[in-house]
Amino acid sequence: MQQSGRTYIAIDLKSFYASVECMERGLDPLTTNLVVADASRTEKTICLAVTPSLKAYGISGRARLFEVVERVKEVNAERRRKAGGELSEKSCDANKLAADPSREVDYLIAPPRMAKYIQISTQVYNVYLKYIAPEDIHVYSIDEVMMDVTNYLQTYRMTARELAKVMISDVLHTTGITATAG
């Protein structure tokens, strides 16, 4: 984004809490069905995060747990109808579910761990600091920043897009978390 001769990059960590929980379990955050929610509360509890593979079923990023339960039931009813009866084993993996429509859609529920999210967010911020000075990084939330990169483009001999790609690639390599930039 350019404003008054300045160039800015906004970076957002994709489904951050859910991505951290997947990475901690050795799972792919882009293909694992997982919600971050306190299941010990009622099903009215709000999910802090939902992975992209569950969002693909029309589940919002801030759904209540009962909405996830109901939507997955609907998806499985449709899969059962198309399979002509019973579904086979359950799976939380979007790739396995896509390859075998007779599998039952399942999902993991991860309890929130704010201390862990802060730790990973700090690691991500330290990646940004390898490229941008702290006074040019404006933190919006635990998973979003806006950076004024105006003074860095000539130094690095890169466009804003190239610099963003380098930083989000470094975030992925360092933490396993997918970031998007604009």
Predicted stretch roles:
Residues M1-A181:
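Gly/Gly-Pro- and Ser/Thr-rich, intrinsically disordered tail segments characteristic of DNA damage-repair
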